[in-house]
Amino acid sequence: IMNKNIEDCSDKMRNHVLYIPHENCLKENLTIIENLRIWLNLIDKKISNYNLNDKLKYFDLYDFKDFPIRNLSHGQKRKVILSKLLLSDSSIWILDEPMNGLDIDSIKKLSRLIENFSESGGAILLSSHVNYKIKKANKIHLKKRKINTIRTQKFITWSEL
């Protein structure tokens, strides 16, 4: 991160990177709020209940905030994990299959969120088996673990990738 080995980085520096895995990494017996509060504590981020509730509205989760995760659909669980994007101050997002399980409206919201983050100077590495229409994206298609094609509006150097 920022020209330093990840093992030599401070927690503060590691917080510049937010990783959203493809699997559900939520505690099933806890509520949406409880799961997000645990994560916020891990990254040492303070946020008011009002602000947290407001962020949950983006992905239409506010009405379910006190539901245990086990009672949510796959798509709702995915949106809980993706809500971390709204709560994080990270400058780099690594997203693994972020749109899997999402409905069309949620995909559009996530696409807007990604585009706004990129336009504000954030960097995103997104892996997907589906070709989503995200504007202003550099796309590298891999086949058998090798670069097959590169589609970009403006190609940057390999070291910048």
Please place each PLM-identified region on the residue numbering.
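ABC ATPase NBD Q-loop/coupling interface
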Residues: I1-K12
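Q-loop/switch helix immediately C-terminal to the Walker
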Residues: E23, E28-D44
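Conserved ABC ATPase signature
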Residues: P68-K77
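Helix N-cap at the start of a conserved alpha-helix in ABC-type nucleotide-binding domains
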Residues: I104-S106
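Catalytic Walker B motif of ABC-type/P-loop ATPase nucleotide-binding domains
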Residues: W93-E97, L102
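Hydrophobic anchor residue at the start of the ABC signature
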Residues: L82, G121
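Conserved ABC ATPase "signature" region
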Residues: R37, N49-F64
